[in-house]
Swiss-Prot record:
The keyword Nucleotidyltransferase applies. Residues 1033-1053 are annotated as: Disordered. This is DNA-directed RNA polymerase subunit beta. The RNAP catalytic core consists of 2 alpha, 1 beta, 1 beta' and 1 omega subunit. When a sigma factor is associated with the core the holoenzyme is formed, which can initiate transcription. HAMAP family: RNApol_bact_RpoB (MF_01321). It comes from the Bacteria. Its EC number is 2.7.7.6. It is an enzyme of class 2 (transferase). One of its GO terms (cellular component) is DNA-directed RNA polymerase complex. Belongs to the RNA polymerase beta chain family.
Length: 1358
């Protein structure tokens, strides 16, 4: 196995037993692929598929005028170049978007001609607003902040059959219903009521008998009965009738008379129930008709209208129940043969027949009027309006669309062969749905499970953006249609017809404020990846928290390999927000698919097939861990499999597929938890969620015990810098890496230089610090895709969210009671859990009514010391250390004329005007914040002169850019001349500076020759002359291109900024705040074991082992058994082994042992037992072995993948190799007394995360502050600078102590007694410390509330 440049430096020992069949797919592909399909930017306009923008345009255009004499057709669209790149957009606070230009064609027809001859065609490109673009990491920059559009899980369009679970009617009877859900348009529901009639609802309105809908479609009562019932034929006589016998229909009936065969033998006696045996005998006897008494007809229902042949009038209508008089009437009319509906109680009920009886309508028009009245109550119906409404409901393409998915699901559910068809409903669709519903009510067929992932589909970014775009286009369509009639007469161009505002507004609204467009969670790389892979059932067209029941939130068998069963938020959204499983993807219909390996005749192949939940249920699927032999044949007699959403066993021959990997069940976050298989699910959920809240530490440290997914997450998250092309590192410093690209990977005429500018100390959305550090050295050879620089929480290209801490499980003086954590001062000293937070503080200078605000260092009534950190423009300088209340940006605001006191008048007379007509509104550092200024940005409105600071920042940026371009040119030039040197060396010249014809070029001569003179050489070989010309041209072009780029940058920097109305200047100051770990901070392991630091203990007081090594953290052992997350204990043991091995290697290096010994030890560690992933140490050079060992000093990193991790025996073996006790326990001594503890203690290394719940952000104290308006009580919460609530239980406590005066003070002057508190303040000023409590304001509020109820209440003074 070949290792990449970074993997070689620190190889993880992998404990997995199963070979890897497929790599983890790119983690952000769900976002990127969807948006790529939406824009189709790389595709030529004529090759574009009908998806995304193209489909939206196609569905709305052509727009035809009302008269039909003009039409506007869509030709194609193109997306321009964005004005600013992503970084510039974030700085300037604008949206990263590109202009969308649409080519449309206006066609005007000749009114006079009969066959619509074309009179005029105009084609033009129309600007349709800005289209936000996705960054390469799957995010959008909207108004300068990074946002993510979360995919939505919604009910797939199609038809669903369901019942109410017996909740509607008191009898508990199941009422069945069918619902046709389109992608857009009206919903159509059919439902049974408790009396078994079928009703229809449109858009969940009032219900009507279902036959009204069918009658509206043009069916008569006879046709309806014919569609839904079979008939029995009778030929009538006066006494007896003959029934055409279909024996199977008699089953279950009670014979009302003896049934005899043709010879007169009785087969069924009167009063007996007819069974299957009787039916067989009847069939055997070959009876085709039965003589039955006329009474047998009573209660049956006529299937067809009885028409008097002579007069043509209807004697008896169809669906009439036969009674004695009806039968007599029929006989009198001389009708011999009649047909009745065949119904029974078992499997064909009289539902449609009953429905027709309650149907008041007789003609299609009456039916349409009924439907019109239901949809638009109170409007008078006309024939046209009724027909129009009905046709627009389900049969018009503009108003109704099932979409390809809906049509496929509908056809599949109704048992049809083809999966395509039209987007609107057909008559057959409606009838088939009704037939299926009635069949289900009759006991044939099953209702659907709406929580099955085969019935829920994922809407990704592209699809949601397309829908929004279509909404905008439809708004435009109306306006265009009205203007088209003018186009003919006034000769308008397409541009005059289309107003792009509504489209742009719809798109902007979606990206800016849709429920699914969320502020990106940017705590660390994992939280970014997880946020982009999130799947939410909430949002427009989805569920709401309040209404979602348990079933929707629950884990469903079809989640297997598609949606993670572990990772979901705790709280009201549990189960509604899910995470995509590691290997899952969504197919063209939007259903989630999971990959499986094909199994043929019990042999596992390497062919991988993706199956959706619909397809999967028919197959037998084995687990990834099923035992196989060398020939990949399944060895067990019975294999554990999944089949039809159940877990069962099956013989190997019956198996069709097998999982690709044990971790395909879980999401990325869950797959980062080692020994996940030993943790309780609830705790694993917390572990997965808390990893997303880990703050990047100052020095990242990779976990000693990982799962092997760390590298994938770090690289796919996009926080690292990876090489675009292979090559050699030309130069590297803190801020950029320059790579000279391999010749093979450079295209002709290309520079062959890649410059990577690193992101230094930038603020993330969560105020954590994004910083990239290069991990390559000059001269290193790298390949494409290698990690060149680590991002936040990344260590040598692997995700590193926390720190490896030496922990002991033991109680310690109650300091770790109830999940508290005791940490050693050593952790603070070594800055192990120190984090950097960056806060952005913004100062805005506006134009006010009294004049404009000014940013200046000349602030009234402020001492010299307060201004010491400001420059002459009034802005703090970079590097200043500031604390609470310090001025960052000096700003003065003009204030209105006020009445002046005599003293002020005197001052004005002496010092002139300035002092008093402005007030100080400077931007100060908020309370509780201390930090260093690391960056300042100044934005000035167009047309306003820039101050000195803005100009200096601008110059600095330009200089940096110029240096980049210069360096790039220098390297390109160097590479060009190197190539020329190689080509020209030893070649013959025709002429050249100081050369004779026919001379050979020497390397020394060329080295001396000034570079400008190289191109004066004329060579004998014509190809070389061409090369010289090309190179000269190439360098010339490059120079011009650089100048153009520089001018573009300069233009961008020097133009004014587009600021909000009324804003003159914005100054943004960035503070870097260093947060050490302290009591009150929240920390957690990866197994849901979270706690708050209770104390930081001096090193000398911490428990230590016999070698004098203290532990870093003491955890409570009681946190393990009841929580059932034993994974943390196994992690601790394996961590101890990993660290021990590291120390062993470290000792060998310090003793300067030979390389062979190191190789032997590494071989013992990496390649001992039945590991599948052997490490090929021979492929590493001695130098690489030494570098590897040096990196292993801190511990040998291990990978124990989920559900395929290290077994107990392997952990023990590792402990042995490290020279530790296999129990994993150590004798510890008390740091304060030096006595040994009574029994050995589990000591080891656990990976600890510092979560973004820091005491500094929560701690807060109030002296005086604002009060609530109504109750006059202090506000609550840190944001409002509020007070601490003294609640009812606290009042009880003071009552219990009898502390009457303290209590009175709490309830009056300290809370809401307005007069009391002002009086008390005055008293304190006068040096008199008495308080006189008055009436609390909340009592007055109570009195007012009682009065508002109409109860008279008065306060009487005694």
């Amino acid at each position: 196995m070949t290792y990449s440049y970074t993997e070689k430096k620190r190889i993880r020992k992998d404990f997995s037993k199963l070979p890897s069949v497929m790599e983890v797919p790119y983690l952000l592909s769900i976002q990127l692929d969807s948006f790529r399909d939406y824009l189709q930017m790389e595709t030529a306009p004529e090759d574009r598929r009908e998806t995304g923008l193209h489909a939206a345009f196609k569905s709305v255009f052509p727009i035809v005028s009302y008269s039909g004499n003009a039409a506007l057709e869509y030709v194609s669209y193109r997306i321009g170049e964005p004005v600013f790149d992503v970084k510039e957009c974030q700085l300037r606070g604008v949206t990263y978007a590109a202009p969308l230009r649409v080519k449309v064609r206006l066609i005007i027809y000749d009114k006079e001609s009969s066959n619509k001859a074309i009179k005029d065609i105009k084609e033009q490109e129309v600007y349709m607003g800005e289209m936000p673009l996705m960054t390469e990491n799957g995010t959008f920059v909207v108004n300068g902040t990074e946002r993510v559009i979360v995919s939505q899980l919604h009910r797939s369009p199609g038809v669903f059959f369901d019942h109410d679970k017996g909740k509607t009617h008191s009898s508990g009877k199941l009422l069945y219903s069918a619902r046709v859900i389109p992608y857009r348009g009206s919903w159509l529901d059919f439902e049974f009521d408790p009396k078994d009639a079928v009703f229809v609802r449109i858009d969940r309105r009032r219900k009507l008998p279902a036959s009204i809908l069918l009658r509206g479609l043009g069916y008569t009562s006879e046709q309806m009965l014919e569609m839904f019932f079979e008939t029995s034929k009778f030929s009538l006589g006066a006494e007896v009738c003959k029934l055409e016998l279909v024996p199977s229909r008699l089953r279950g009936d009670i014979a009302t008379f003896d049934i005899k065969d043709n010879d007169g033998n009785v087969i069924v006696e009167e009063g007996r129930r007819i069974t299957a045996r009787h039916i067989k005998q009847l069939e055997k006897a070959g009876i085709t008709e039965l003589e039955v008494p006329t009474e047998y007809l009573y209660g049956r229902v006529l299937a067809k209208d009885m028409i008097d042949q002579s007069t043509g009038e209807v004697l008896v209508e169809c669906n009439t129940e036969l009674t004695e008089e009806v039968v007599t009437k029929i006989l009198d009319a001389g009708v011999k043969d009649i047909e009745t509906l065949y119904t029974n109680d078992l499997d064909c009920g009289p539902f449609m027949s009953d429905t027709l009886r309650i149907d008041p309508t007789r003609t299609p028009l009456e039916a349409l009027v009924e439907i019109y009245r239901m949809m638009r109550p109170g409007e008078p119906p006309t024939k046209e309006s009724a027909e129009n409404l009905f046709n627009n409901l389900f049969f018009s393409e503009e108003r109704y669309d099932l979409s390809a998915v809906g049509r496929m699901k509908l056809n599949r559910r109704l048992g049809r062969e083809e999966s395509t068809g039209e987007g609107t409903l057909t008559h057959d669709d409606i009838i088939d749905v009704l037939k299926t519903l009635i069949a289900i009510r009759n006991g044939q067929g099953q209702v659907d499970d709406i929580d099955n992932l085969g019935n829920r589909r994922v809407r990704c970014v592209g699809e949601m953006a397309e829908n929004q775009f279509r909404v905008g286009l439809v708004r435009v369509e109306r306006a265009v249609r009205e203007r088209l009639s003018l186009a003919e007469s006034e000769g308008l161009m397409p541009q005059d017809l289309i107003n792009a505002k509504p489209v742009a507004a719809a798109v902007k609204e979606f990206f800016g404020s849709s429920q699914l467009s969320q502020f990106m969670d940017q705590n660390n790389p994992l939280s970014e990846v997880t946020h982009k892979r999130r799947i939410s059932a909430l949002g427009p067209g989805g569920l709401t928290r309040e209404r979602a029941g348990f079933e929707v939130r629950d884990v469903h068998p079809t989640h297997y390999g598609r949606v993670c069963p572990i990772e979901t938020p705790e709280g009201p959204n549990i189960g509604l927000i899910n995470s995509l499983a590691t290997y899952a993807r969504s197919n063209s219909y939007g259903f989630l698919e999971s990959p499986y390996r094909k199994v043929v005749d019990g042999v596992v192949t390497d062919e991988v097939v993706y199956l959706s939940a619909i397809e999967e249920s028919n197959y037998v699927i084995a687990q990834a861990s099923a035992a196989t032999d060398e020939g990949k044949r399944l060895t067990d007699e019975l294999v554990t499999v999944r089949h039809q959403n159940e877990f069962t066993v099956a013989p190997p021959e019956a198996v069709n597929f097998m999982d690709v990997s044990p971790r395909q069940v879980v999401s990325v976050a869950a797959s980062l938890i080692p020994f996940l298989e030993h943790d309780d699910a609830n705790r694993a959920l917390m572990g997965a969620n808390m990893q997303r809240q880990a703050v990047p530490t100052l020095k990242s440290q990779v976990p000693l015990v990982g799962t092997g997914v760390e590298r994938t997450v770090a690289q796919d998250s996009g926080v690292c810098v990876t090489a675009r092309r292979g090559g050699v590192i030309e130069s590297v410093d803190a801020a950029r890496i320059v790579v000279r690209v391999n010749n093979e990977e450079t295209e002709a005429g290309d520079a062959g230089v890649d410059i990577y500018n690193l992101t230094k100390y930038t603020r993330s959305n969560q105020n954590t610090c994004i910083n990239q550090r290069s991990i390559v050295r000059q001269g290193d050879v790298i390949a494409r895709g290698d990690v060149l620089a680590d991002g936040p929480s990344v260590d040598l290209g692997e995700l590193a969210l926390g720190q490896n801490m030496r922990i002991a499980f033991m109680p310690w003086n109650g300091y770790n009671f109830e999940d508290s954590i005791l940490i050693s001062e050593k952790v603070v000293q070594e800055d192990r859990l120190t984090t950097i937070h960056i806060q952005e503080l913004t100062c805005v200078a506006r134009d006010t009514k009294l004049g404009s605000e000014e940013i200046t260092a000349d602030i009234p009534n402020v001492g010299e010391s307060a201004l010491s950190k400001l420059d002459e423009s009034g802005i703090v300088y970079i590097g200043a250390e500031v604390g609470p209340g310090d001025i960052l940006v000096g700003k003065v605001t003009p204030k209105g004329e006020t009445q002046l006191t005599p003293e002020e008048k005197l001052l004005r007379a002496i010092f002139g005007e300035k002092a008093s007509d402005v007030k100080d509104t400077s931007q100060r550092v908020p309370t509780g914040t201390r930090g260093t200024v690391i960056d300042v940005q100044v934005f000035t409105r167009d047309g306003i002169e820039k101050d000195a600071r803005a100009l200096s920042i601008e110059k600095e940026q330009l200089d940096k850019y110029r240096k980049d371009l210069k360096d790039e040119y220098r390297i390109v030039e160097g590479a060009t001349f190197e190539r020329l040197m190689a080509a020209l060396k030893g070649q013959e010249v025709i002429s050249g500076p100081g050369l004779k014809k026919g001379a050979k070029l020497e390397e020394a001569y060329l080295a001396e020759l000034p570079r400008a003179d190289w191109f004066k050489l004329r060579m004998k070989d014509e190809a070389l002359n061409e090369l010289l010309e090309k190179s000269e041209q190439g360098l010339e072009d490059r120079k011009k291109e650089h100048e153009a780029r520089f001018d573009d940058k300069k233009g961008k920097l020097q133009q004014g900024d587009d600021l909000a109305p009324g804003v003159l200047k914005i100054v943004k100051v960035y503070l870097a705040i260093k947060r050490r770990i302290q009591p009150g901070d929240k920390m957690a392991g990866r197994h849901g074991n979270k706690g708050v630091i209770s104390a930081v203990m001096p090193i000398e007081d911490m428990p230590y082992d016999e070698f004098g090594n203290t532990v870093d953290i003491v955890l409570n052992p009681l946190g393990v058994p009841s929580r059932m997350n034993v994974g943390q204990v196994l992690e601790t043991h394996l961590g101890a082994a990993a660290k021990g091995l590291g120390e062993r290697i470290s000792r060998m290096l310090d003793e300067q042992r030979k390389v062979a010994e190191l190789r032997k030890l590494l071989d013992e560690i990496y390649n001992h037992s039945d590991e599948v992933f052997k490490v090929d140490l021979d492929s590493l050079t001695d130098k690489e072995i030494f570098e590897l060992c040096n990196n292993l000093r801190g511990g040998v990193p291990m990978a124990t993948p989920v559900f395929d991790g290290a077994k107990e025996a392997e952990v023990k073996r590792m402990l042995e190799l490290a020279g530790l006790d296999t129990t994993g326990q150590t004798k510890l001594y008390d740091g304060r007394t030096g006595d040994a503890f009574d029994r050995p203690v589990t000591v080891g290394y656990m990976y600890i995360l510092k979560l973004n719940h820091l005491i500094d952000d929560k701690m807060h104290a109030r002296s005086t502050g604002s009060y609530s308006l109504v109750t006059q009580q202090p506000l609550g919460g840190k944001a409002q600078f509020g007070g601490q609530r003294f609640g009812e239980m606290e009042v009880w406590a003071l009552e219990a102590y009898g502390a009457a005066y303290t209590l009175q003070e709490m309830l009056t002057v300290k809370s809401d007694d307005v007069n009391g508190r002002t009086k008390m303040y005055k008293n304190i000023v006068d040096g008199d410390h008495r308080m006189e409590p008055g009436m609390p304001e909340s009592f007055n509020v109570l009195v007012k509330e009682i009065r508002s109820l109409g109860i008279d209440i008065e306060l009487e003074s005694e």
